[in-house]
Amino acid sequence: MTLTVSRIFDSEKNKDRFDSCVILRLLLFVLIPNLITTPLRIFVEAVIEGKEGAPAFVTVPFIIYGICAELVVGLGYLVIGYKLPIKNTVLRGFAYIMLILISSYIPNILAMLGGDGKIIEESLSMGILVVDVISYSLKGLVLGLLMKNYDVKNPDEIEQITNTRFIICSIIYGALFAALNFLTDIAAGAINSSWRFCSILGVSTERENLFYIVFTIFMFMAGVLLPLWNRYCLPKKASISASIIFALEISLFVWLPNVLIMAFFGTPFMLTMAYGIAYVFMIMICVLVYRSSISLTNM
């Protein structure tokens, strides 16, 4: 992660993307949606869930994490989001946030549908889903408007592939990502049974099978959608080192903010961090396999 951030700020071709005006826009991107969605979250929870006051997870550390996560997501637009091939800069900013919504947030949150227990009950509710979807839409609109005049061209040539080839590579990516999740769970459970996904989330024994079926389906879905970033942002004929750096960027800006937040809903902090690190390696493997798949289909 340090290598990625250092490379971003040290590169001469990137310096014009991080002037004071851009940093100010990032701060506004963090501030404006949070000023609206935090009161909205309390209101929706009260109306839909019938709860009084703020939800239990809305604490000062949670708000601080949310601000830091949004800053990371905003930074991600300056690193990979601006590369999306959409001419209208407002729509480009909106599309960047929506792509995070469908490729990261939706699979992560819905992957818990098959489980039960207090942690899942707290983190997966109609109120949370409603507010989060509204929040993502608002963030996309705010980012697009703030970056309306930010039209930096992608310096890298992108691989042009047919839809058929892309679908095949995406299915391979999806199957591999789901399999890596499954194998990671088995490996963790072999060391200590309390390290399994179901144990960390407090899923009852009766719901374990259903939990893993649903979880695997949505991890496959995530694996099918994540290659959209590869298609539009991964440089053509990227080297292994460039592909690894790209995987680190996808992990940091797209995937991890929606994984690490679970620590605020009750998952053990160190185990949550450990799975976050594991996901970095999973995404790294998937990006390298995707790169190889594209190369093979070009032969």
Model regions and ranges:
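Juxtamembrane/disordered regions of integral membrane proteins
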Residues: T2-M299
